[in-house]
Amino acid sequence: IDVSRSMQAQDLAPDRLTKTKLWAAELVQILKGQQIGLVVFAGAAYMYMPLTDDYNAAIDFINGITTEMASYQGTAIGDAIETAQKAFGDETNKSRGLVIISDGEDHDSNAIQAAEKAAKKGIVITTIGAGTEKGALIPEQDDLGFKYKLDEEGQPVRSKLNKEELIKIAAAAHGRYYSLDNPRSALEGVKNMVDNLDKGTYDVHETSNNISLFPWLLWPAFFLFLIEMIMSMNISIKTKSNNRT
């Protein structure tokens, strides 16, 4: 989960953070039967919810997520990937998928390197772009009321989606990039990743079907998912069968 303040920008309605929650609510339904964990990140990353198949508990965790959770600003995607990798452990009889939802702005320099290391551990990464390339101002609120974030020169800060970086991160870990502005395609893409985690790598591509979310599926949910699926270990099964023979 990217919880940096830029996720409050309103180039996605009603804002990036809320849009992500609505989209991820549907994803939770698709991923039932898998273990899901949650990492939140801004200037740093930490494990917010360990891997679990308790979806009610997961939603309770998500209900508490805000951009105020971040002590340091930034977009530490590399740190988030490393945190997720540690949560997965070193088991080789399971396939793992990582879904990162972020605007990709102000990213750390080691994100691609972290993705490459994750790929060597068999982790496939899908990135979801939250925002638009045109961007939007970042709203803030203090005791004096509503305002926009200003830079050092006193000018409003416009936050823009860094799509290119998110595409590179996905490519480094054999994954695909999707836009949160096209929620149905993104859902189908993640579902495809889960269904095919044990079938090889993926080509990075971008899709463009723009389909609205259904109101009855607008639940609070995840930005960054850890998906762990038990793989069918054919070689292992054959070995055990031969030993019994």
List each model region and its residues.
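Structural recognition of the beta-strand scaffold that forms the well-ordered cores
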Residues: 39, 100, 126-129, 178-179
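Extended, hydrophilic extramembrane loops/domains of integral membrane proteins
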Residues: 166-196
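Membrane-embedded segments
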Residues: 1-96, 110-113
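VWA/integrin I-like adhesion module and closely mimicked acidic/polar interface patches used
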Residues: 71-75, 97, 104-172
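C-terminal signal-anchor/stop-transfer transmembrane helix together with its immediate cytosolic
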Residues: 196-245
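Short, hinge-like loop/turn segments at secondary-structure boundaries
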Residues: 54-57, 143-146, 195-198
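Solvent-exposed loop/turn segments at secondary-structure junctions
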Residues: 5-6, 43-47, 104-107, 131-135, ...
